[in-house]
């Protein structure tokens, strides 16, 4: 269902508080649903910092918002938020449920897509994955940069040959 004005107002205040608590602790590589960040800032970061790594991780967590485990999310929140009333309030938002054809449906997992606090809660939940992957990746990032692919080396060599031929042809 559509939240009332009062619910939206309370959610916005909770979102602002959560952002103040967590925003400075998210990984710099995280760009989704964050202030002053977008897919464009993510692409710019890749363009500026790419060093020929050996591997990438790309993912799309299908049905993410529908499948967030409430208990795990609450446990993550409790690591930084000790106020039990705040935790209860967030749990109430998660468990609010919805009305469909005048019948109430409880919510036992997931977050409402389009909910005011859903994006920040998603980032809090996925920050654990970001930190794990950063630590995991560091085990593979040895040396200055990864070895470039053979195809890239061949293309680079061919480009140099063509450039040399062009210089020779224009100088004659």
Segments predicted by a language model, with ranges:
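Non-catalytic terminal/accessory segments
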Residues: 1-172
């Amino acid at each position: 269902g559509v939240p009332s004005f009062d619910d939206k107002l309370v959610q916005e205040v909770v979102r602002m508080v959560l952002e103040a608590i967590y925003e400075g602790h998210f990984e710099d590589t995280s760009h989704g649903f964050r202030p002053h960040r977008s897919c464009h800032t993510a692409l710019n970061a890749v363009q500026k910092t790419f060093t020929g790594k050996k591997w990438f991780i790309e993912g799309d967590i299908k049905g993410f918002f529908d499948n967030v485990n409430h208990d795990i999310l609450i446990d993550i929140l409790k690591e930084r938020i000790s106020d039990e009333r705040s935790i209860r309030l967030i749990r109430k938002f998660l468990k609010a449920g919805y009305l469909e054809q005048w019948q109430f449906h409880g919510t036992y997992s997931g977050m409402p897509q389009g909910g005011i606090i859903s994006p920040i809660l998603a980032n809090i939940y996925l920050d654990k994955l970001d930190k794990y992957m950063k630590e995991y990746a560091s085990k593979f990032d040895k040396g200055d940069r990864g070895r470039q692919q053979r195809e890239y080396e061949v293309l680079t060599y061919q480009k140099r040959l063509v450039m040399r031929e062009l210089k020779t042809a224009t100088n004659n």
